[in-house]
Amino acid sequence: MKVREVIRILENNGFRLDRQKGSHRRFEGVVEGQIRGVTVAGKESDEINKATLASIRRQSKLPNELFRSG
């Protein structure tokens, strides 16, 4: 899964870009009544490795199904 796909998933689920420094983007959104912060690193065309994607899923508290590619 590419960084741009993860960003699209976050934005489609109410997350908004809070700040950016270099290739690191910090998104904030409300999930289950709580403000969640998610950091996404890399250029939009970069592939995200499995461990990083798992961390993004944990940070966001969004359903795992949203992050399944295919």
Where are these regions (language model features)?
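A short, structured beta-strand/loop element
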Residues: 19-53
